[in-house]
C-alpha cells in the first residue's frame, strides 16, 4: 500500500487499543478460574483472537457481546481435549503461555502457527517443561513449531534460572507451577513485564516475588474476576515517536498503561530530550494520559536492564534515533533476532533503504542521526511493528513515495492504526 508522506503536523487526542499482553492473560486466567470473568476494553487484534479461539477449542465458553468478553471458567483441571490441532496464528505469546497451561492436562495436543511463528524457537519453554514431566517436542533441535505436547497430572515443581530475559517463558512456567504439587522457584535473568504476577493475585492466586525470584506453591484454585484492560503502551509508542519527530505536533494519548515493567520508552524519550508529560495517573489500573510535542532530540545509549522494559518498542525507538542529533547505541537486545522477524536486520534494512544510517550489531544497532528520509519500498515480512514503524517514518518523507508490502500484518496488534493516523493528520 502507498503510505502518507510529507506531513506538516499531527494534532489530536486518541485512545489506543487495549494492551496485548494483558488481553492474552485475561483470557487465559478467565478460562482457568472457577466462575465467570468479564473483560472490558480487550484488544481485538489477530493474536488475541487466536488465544480466544484456542480456549474455545479447549472447551471454554467465551462470549463477545456489546464490547464485553464473558468467560465461563472451567477451573485448572477443566480443559478438554480439542478435536483438532490448535492454531496459534502469528502469536508467540499464545503458543508459549498455552504450553505452560497444558502442562497439567492429561491429553495430547498439536500446536501450530503461521510461517513466521514456525521459525521461532520454542526450546526456551520446552526444556524447562520437560524437566517438570511434560512430553513436548517440535521440529529441529530448537523445537520450532508445530509442537506436540502431552501433559501430566503428576507435574513436578521446578527450580529454574531463566537463561534469557523472557516474560513469555516465565509466564509459561508460572502457569505450569500452579498445577504442580509443591513449591516452584523461577529466577529471572532481568526483571520482565509482570502482568502474569499481577493478574495471578487479582484472580485470588498466591505467589511471592523477591527481586528476580518468583515462588509459586501449587496446586492452586483461581476465581473469576472483572478485568479492565488499559491501553497498550507498545501501540502508544508509535504515536509518542510521531508526536516527537513530526514538526509542529502535539498529541494526547489517553488511558495508556504505565506498568513500571513496560515504561522503558518513557525513560528513553526523556534521556533524548523529548517533551513528554504524564497526567491523570490511575494507580489501580496503572494507566495515565501521555502528551508529547515536537522536540529537538539527542542520541543516547540503551542497554542492560532497560531492554526487557522496551523490547517491543525498539523498532520505533530506532526510528526516533534517526531523528536525534548524534549517535544512539542499542545493545544487549539479541532477543530481537527471534521476534516475528529478525528485528535487528529488518529494522536496519527498512530504515536504511529510506536514508537512515544504521549499523546492525550482534546484539543491537548503532544509529547515526539526524537523517533526512526519502521514499522507498519496504516489506513488513509479516511483522506488525515493522509496518507501523514504516508508516510513521513515511510521515517525514518529502522526496518520493513509500510503498509498504504486506501492510495487513498491522492487524496483529492494531486493527484501527490507519484510522487513528488519519484522525491525527486532520486534527
Swiss-Prot record:
EC number of this enzyme: 2.5.1.19
Residue positions binding 3-phosphoshikimate: 20-21, 25, 166, 168, 312, 339
Keyword Kinase in record: no
GO biological process, one term: amino acid biosynthetic process
Location in or out of the cell: Cytoplasm
Listed pathway(s): Metabolic intermediate biosynthesis; chorismate biosynthesis; chorismate from D-erythrose 4-phosphate and phosphoenolpyruvate: step 6/7
Gene3D superfamilies with a match to the protein in the record: Enolpyruvate transferase domain
Pfam families: EPSP_synthase (PF00275)
Any one of the GO CC terms: cytoplasm
Catalytic reaction annotation: 3-phosphoshikimate + phosphoenolpyruvate = 5-O-(1-carboxyvinyl)-3-phosphoshikimate + phosphate
Active-site residues annotated for this sequence: 312 (proton acceptor)
Primary localization class, coarse: cytoplasm
Matches recorded under SUPFAM superfamilies: EPT/RTPC-like (SSF55205)
Key words, A-Z: Amino-acid biosynthesis, Aromatic amino acid biosynthesis, Cytoplasm, Transferase
Annotated GO MF terms: 3-phosphoshikimate 1-carboxyvinyltransferase activity
Cited function: Catalyzes the transfer of the enolpyruvyl moiety of phosphoenolpyruvate (PEP) to the 5-hydroxyl of shikimate-3-phosphate (S3P) to produce enolpyruvyl shikimate-3-phosphate and inorganic phosphate.
Similarity remark: Belongs to the EPSP synthase family.
Entries under NCBIfam families matching the protein: aroA (TIGR01356)
Name of the featured protein: 3-phosphoshikimate 1-carboxyvinyltransferase
Gene transcribed to yield this protein: aroA
Amino acid at each position: 500500500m502507498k503510505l502518507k508522506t510529507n506531513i506538516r503536523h499531527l494534532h489530536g487526542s486518541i485512545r489506543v487499543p487495549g494492551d496485548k499482553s494483558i488481553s492474552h492473560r485475561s483470557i487465559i486466567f478467565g478460562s482457568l478460574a472457577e466462575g465467570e470473568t468479564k473483560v472490558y476494553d480487550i484488544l481485538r487484534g489477530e493474536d488475541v483472537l487466536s488465544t480466544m479461539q484456542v480456549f474455545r477449542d479447549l472447551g471454554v465458553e467465551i462470549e463477545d457481546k456489546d464490547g464485553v468478553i464473558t468467560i465461563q471458567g472451567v477451573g485448572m483441571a477443566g480443559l478438554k481435549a480439542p478435536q483438532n490441532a490448535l492454531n496459534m496464528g502469528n502469536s508467540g505469546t499464545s503458543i508459549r503461555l498455552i504450553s505452560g497451561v497444558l502442562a497439567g492436562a492429561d491429553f495430547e495436543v498439536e500446536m501450530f502457527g503461521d510461517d513466521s511463528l514456525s521459525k521461532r524457537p520454542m526450546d526456551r519453554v520446552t526444556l524447562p517443561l520437560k524437566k517438570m514431566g511434560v512430553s513436548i517436542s517440535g521440529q529441529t533441535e530448537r523445537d520450532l513449531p508445530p509442537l506436540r505436547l502431552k501433559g501430566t497430572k503428576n507435574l513436578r515443581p521446578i527450580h529454574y534460572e531463566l537463561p534469557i530475559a523472557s516474560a513469555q517463558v516465565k509466564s509459561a512456567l508460572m502457569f505450569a507451577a500452579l498445577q504442580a504439587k509443591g513449591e516452584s522457584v523461577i529466577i529471572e535473568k532481568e526483571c520482565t513485564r509482570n502482568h502474569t504476577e499481577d493478574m495471578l493475585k487479582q484472580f485470588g492466586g498466591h505467589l511471592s516475588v523477591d527481586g528476580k525470584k518468583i515462588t509459586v506453591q501449587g496446586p492452586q484454585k483461581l476465581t473469576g474476576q472483572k478485568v479492565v484492560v488499559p491501553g497498550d503502551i507498545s501501540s502508544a509508542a508509535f504515536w509518542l515517536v510521531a508526536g516527537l519527530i513530526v514538526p509542529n505536533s502535539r498529541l494526547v494519548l489517553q488511558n495508556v498503561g504505565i506498568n513500571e515493567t513496560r515504561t522503558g520508552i518513557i525513560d528513553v524519550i526523556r534521556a533524548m530530550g523529548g517533551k513528554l508529560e504524564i497526567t491523570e495517573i490511575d494507580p489501580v489500573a496503572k494507566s495515565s494520559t501521555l502528551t508529547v510535542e515536537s522536540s529537538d532530540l539527542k542520541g543516547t545509549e540503551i542497554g542492560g536492564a532497560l531492554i526487557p522494559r522496551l523490547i517491543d518498542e525498539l523498532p520505533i525507538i530506532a526510528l526516533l534515533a534517526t531523528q536525534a542529533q548524534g549517535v544512539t547505541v542499542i545493545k544487549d537486545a539479541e532477543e530481537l533476532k527471534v521476534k516475528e522477524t529478525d528485528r535487528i536486520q529488518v529494522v536496519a534494512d527498512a530504515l536504511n533503504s529510506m536514508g537512515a544510517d544504521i549499523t546492525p550489531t550482534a546484539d543491537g544497532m548503532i544509529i547515526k542521526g539526524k537523517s533526512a528520509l526519502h521514499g522507498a519500498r519496504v516489506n513488513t515480512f509479516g511483522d506488525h511493528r515493522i509496518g507501523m514503524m514504516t508508516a510513521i517514518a513515511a510521515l517525514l518523507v518529502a522526496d518520493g513515495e513509500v510503498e509498504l508490502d504486506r501492510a495487513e500484518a498491522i492487524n496483529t496488534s492494531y486493527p484501527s492504526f490507519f484510522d487513528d493516523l488519519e484522525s491525527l493528520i486532520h486534527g
